[in-house]
């Protein structure tokens, strides 16, 4: 299966019959895992997801998320969860494929911690919240691919992202 800890993460592939492209809805369920890899307890006060071209946010599928703009959403679901060193927590977001006969290929969803806090007001020593800087440990991606079927349909709906805090 697909694991958030894989780096790089495998691409989840969905192949569609050409005749069914305009009749199908594809929803990708992403699990965003936050882990405290630091030495002090802390909070991930807000998480931000950067929606890739080809996917869209549907508010009815995601009542605990707020849309900032067409390609950015946030949630504060983890704001009151004190993560001790080594602790993890997860949230989910569902993104929907934009149904279009030209919308194929790899779509790379990114999520990061956009606000964090600890009782010592100590900054994260190896990343900066809310800077959308790939390569830091508070941001991760999960690629998906939609294509035209050449064989049997495979459907995967759960994809992991690992976001690390403190």
How does the language model describe each region?
Residues 1-166:
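Exported/extracytosolic protein signature
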């Amino acid at each position: 299966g697909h694991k958030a800890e894989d780096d790089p993460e495998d691409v989840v592939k969905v192949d569609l019959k050409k005749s069914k492209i305009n009749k199908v809805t594809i929803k990708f369920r992403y699990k965003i895992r936050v882990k405290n890899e630091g030495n002090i307890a802390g909070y991930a006060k807000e998480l931000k997801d950067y929606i890739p071209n080809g996917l869209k946010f549907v508010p009815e599928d995601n009542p605990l998320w707020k849309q900032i703009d067409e390609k950015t959403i946030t949630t504060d679901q983890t704001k009151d969860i004190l993560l001790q060193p080594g602790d993890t927590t997860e949230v989910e977001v569902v993104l929907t494929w934009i149904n279009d006969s030209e919308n194929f290929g790899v779509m790379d969803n990114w999520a990061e911690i956009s606000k964090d806090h600890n009782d010592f007001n100590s900054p994260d020593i190896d990343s900066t919240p809310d800077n959308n800087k790939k390569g830091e440990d508070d941001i991760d991606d999960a690629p998906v691919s939609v294509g035209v079927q050449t064989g049997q349909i495979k459907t995967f709906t759960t994809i992991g992202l690992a976001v690390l805090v403190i």
